[in-house]
């Protein structure tokens, strides 16, 4: 089993779209039993997978009580892909972790869920607090979507510093340039500055995910966006195999 965190210190970089599409690739391309665990109280991952929230807010009960996390897992319409949706109850999850005094709570929960899943993908909130620290300890690989701008390297340095501060054995980091439009001079310059970073293009098919409530590969499998996510997932599997 491997756990992969999609993390950014700022919003608006396509983090949730990354999480949903990579989870779909894990289940569909690699045929892995995959769980997408939404840790962002906005609950975008469940929405994009067509899973409507339940009226009772209970996502935080996994962390505060001895509740079986599998009881909150929801099936999706995509074979091999389940989601553990978020809700407003985890908005104060950082304080909850601190009050519990359990710095490896997420690690233990992930280990428990790994009995039934080959890949666990975290959709993380854009925060620097105890939630992000718990994710750093639980993840085997960190995917960091970054906008194509001169500030990308600086944003990555912030994440690297946070990861290194999380303790020994921190996960490797894979930066990905997100929402790239090669017609724009600034985007081309950013791409030229970091030629080894994988790229996800700015594409209408990706924006359409919110309308279709499906991963792009499910409704536009031949689109450049679908190919880009498939290539990124292949790179992720390769990196995981290398350890």
For the regions a protein language model found, what residue spans apply to each?
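P-loop NTP-binding core
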Residues: 1-243
């Amino acid at each position: 089993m491997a756990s992969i965190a999609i993390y950014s210190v700022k919003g608006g970089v396509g983090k949730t779209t990354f999480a949903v599409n990579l989870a779909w690739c894990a289940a569909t391309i690699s045929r892995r039993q995959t769980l997408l665990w939404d840790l962002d109280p906005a609950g975008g991952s469940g929405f994009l997978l067509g899973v409507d929230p339940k009226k009772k807010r209970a996502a935080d009960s996994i962390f505060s009580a001895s509740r079986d996390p599998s009881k909150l897992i929801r099936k999706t319409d995509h074979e091999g892909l389940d989601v553990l949706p978020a809700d407003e109850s985890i908005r104060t999850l950082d304080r909850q972790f601190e009050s519990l005094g359990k710095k490896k709570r997420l690690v233990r929960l992930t280990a428990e869920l790994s009995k039934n899943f080959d890949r666990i993908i975290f959709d993380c909130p854009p925060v620097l607090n105890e939630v992000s620290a718990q994710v750093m300890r639980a993840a085997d690989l960190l995917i960091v979507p970054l906008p194509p701008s001169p500030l990308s390297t600086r944003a990555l340095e912030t994440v690297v510093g946070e990861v290194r501060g999380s303790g020994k054995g921190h996960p490797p980091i894979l930066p990905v340039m997100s929402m790239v439009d090669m017609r724009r001079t600034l985007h081309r310059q950013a791409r030229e500055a970091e030629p080894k970073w994988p790229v996800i293009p700015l594409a209408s098919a990706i924006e359409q995910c919110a309308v279709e409530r499906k991963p792009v590969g499910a409704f536009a499998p031949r689109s450049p966006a679908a190919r880009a996510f498939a290539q990124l997932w292949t790179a992720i599997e390769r990196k995981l195999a290398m350890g």
